[in-house]
């Protein structure tokens, strides 16, 4: 059952919710942050990334979660995600890039779902998996227009390479809280 994670309160580990992402390549970090600032992004947002396992909450063991992610990450090699056929998902308040799901990122997602899914509750259905990069989230309509025009100048190349995944956790509610990286996991390193 889907819930609105916006106002979840911090758990016994000090975080309201968690997600697993592949951080954007370094060359995109600054341009993506520039877009967020220009569009007026105020809601807590993770810096440029592709979501690999969607938002979840109510975990029983942070150490158990870290161990499970480490194990899964070690079993998967770095991923190339093609930009051909990419869609722009736009709403009144958000701009999201949708990528075609390839077998490698789907397998990583599926393994995370199998191993991480039972350790907490998903805020929304993760399947079917939709590989995406949120550019701005819950901004004013003029912010959407700004972000939309700026992504036209963004050079994503033919593919994005991901060599790591991050466990991110939100400290506090969405408006006023902050996302923090709890740990980075190298893909293919057991």
Regions found by a protein language model. Give the residues of each.
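Surface-exposed, active-site-proximal loop segments in enzymatic domains
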Residues: 92-99
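Short proline/glycine- and acidic-rich turn/helix-capping motifs at secondary-structure junctions
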Residues: 84-92, 131, 164-174
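Basic, often amphipathic N-terminal segments
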Residues: 1-80, 99-164, 176-190
């Amino acid at each position: 059952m889907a819930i609105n994670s916006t106002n979840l309160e911090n758990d016994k580990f000090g975080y309201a919710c968690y997600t697993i992402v592949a951080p954007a390549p370094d060359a995109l970090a600054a341009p993506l942050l520039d877009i967020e600032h220009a569009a007026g992004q105020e809601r807590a947002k993770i810096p440029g990334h592709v979501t690999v396992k969607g938002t979840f909450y109510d975990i029983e063991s942070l150490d158990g979660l870290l161990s499970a992610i480490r194990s899964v990450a070690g079993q998967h090699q770095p991923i190339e995600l093609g930009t051909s056929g990419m869609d722009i998902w736009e709403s009144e308040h958000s701009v999201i890039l949708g990528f075609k799901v390839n077998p490698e990122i789907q397998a990583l997602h599926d393994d995370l779902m199998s191993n991480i899914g039972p350790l907490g509750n998903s805020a929304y259905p993760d399947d079917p998996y939709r590989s995406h990069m949120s550019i701005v989230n819950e901004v004013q309509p003029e912010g959407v227009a700004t972000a939309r025009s700026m992504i036209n100048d963004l050079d994503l190349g033919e593919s994005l390479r991901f060599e790591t995944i991050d466990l991110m956790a939100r400290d506090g509610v969405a408006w006023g809280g902050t996302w923090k990286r709890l740990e980075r996991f190298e893909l293919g390193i057991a």
